[in-house]
């Protein structure tokens, strides 16, 4: 069994080899994208055993994703191949002003059909930690239920829960998911968020105040707050440390 398990969406990213608008048909290279798959890969590169649970389409893009994740030493036995839905794809566009635009083709994707039945409870409960993000629960109602169920499995098995809100307002559309995000944070053992996400969810960019709010009444053990070029903060309920940027 793996020490770390990540659960959520992965996609194929088509990245242009040079600057140019999509309408001019730039050449693309194919890469893997997705916070959860990237986390599983990063943990494996650091020498930890990791497993990735997701759902992909029965297509060439899905085959590519499995091959790339497996090549990094990640256990892919928890990946479900969906014969009825396609693998999600994203295109990046580097515009003349060097601004990057991202175009998603993920509606009704295989990953959006991920459900509790795709998750082996024993894998979650025998792991040291399970990692989830706020992207998965806004993809669909079944994804949302799956995230809650995985957290319940982890709590029952005394597995630590790592959560990154990873807020993407484009995915939220007209729905209000802030209460849900706060609820998921309260269920988590370790939380990583950006300073702007803290402001959006809790109304403050004061890290000490943010920590005071998050450590009250929940299961939280550790909080990491990122602030780009300014570095990051990490804290428990007693200590707060600033980590300078690399």
Label each region the model flagged.
Residues 1-75, 98:
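Glycine-rich phosphate/adenosyl-contacting loop at the front of the ribokinase-like
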Residues 3-5, 152, 156, 205-246:
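Conserved phosphate-binding/catalytic region of the ribokinase-like
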Residues 46, 154-158, 187:
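Helix C-cap/helix->beta junction micro-motif
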Residues 49-134, 156:
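Conserved N-terminal subdomain of the carbohydrate kinase-like
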Residues 70-74, 175-200:
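Structural recognition of alpha->loop->beta junctions
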Residues 122-123, 183-184, 216:
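Structural alpha-helical scaffold elements that stabilize or flank donor/cofactor-binding regions
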Residues 136-145, 173, 201-203:
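Glycine/threonine-rich flexible loop motifs
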Residues 144-149, 175-182, 205-211, 245:
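Charged helix-capping and loop-helix junction motifs
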């Amino acid at each position: 069994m793996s020490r770390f398990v990540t659960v959520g969406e992965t996609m194929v990213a088509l990245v242009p080899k040079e600057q140019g608008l999509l309408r001019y048909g730039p050449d693309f290279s194919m890469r893997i994208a997705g916070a959860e798959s990237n986390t599983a890969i990063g943990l494996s590169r650091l020498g930890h055993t990791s497993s990735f649970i997701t759902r992909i389409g029965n297509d060439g893009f899905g085959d590519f994703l499995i091959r790339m994740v497996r090549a990094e030493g990640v256990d892919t036995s928890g990946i479900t191949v969906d014969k009825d839905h396609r693998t999600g794809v994203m295109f990046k566009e580097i515009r003349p002003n060097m601004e990057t635009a991202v175009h998603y083709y993920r509606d009704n994707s295989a990953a959006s059909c991920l459900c509790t039945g795709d998750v082996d409870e024993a894998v979650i409960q025998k792991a040291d930690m399970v990692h989830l993000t706020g992207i998965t629960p806004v993809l669909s109602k079944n994804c949302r239920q799956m995230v809650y169920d995985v957290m319940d499995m982890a709590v029952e098995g005394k597995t630590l829960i790592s959560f990154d809100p990873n807020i993407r307002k484009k995915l939220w559309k007209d729905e209000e998911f802030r209460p849900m995000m706060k609820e998921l944070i309260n269920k988590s053992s370790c939380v990583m968020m950006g300073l702007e996400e803290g402001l959006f969810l809790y109304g403050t960019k004061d890290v000490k105040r943010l920590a005071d709010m998050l450590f009250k009444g929940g299961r939280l053990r550790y909080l990491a707050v990122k602030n780009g070029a300014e570095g990051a903060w990490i804290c428990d309920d007693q200590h707060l440390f600033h980590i300078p940027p690399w």
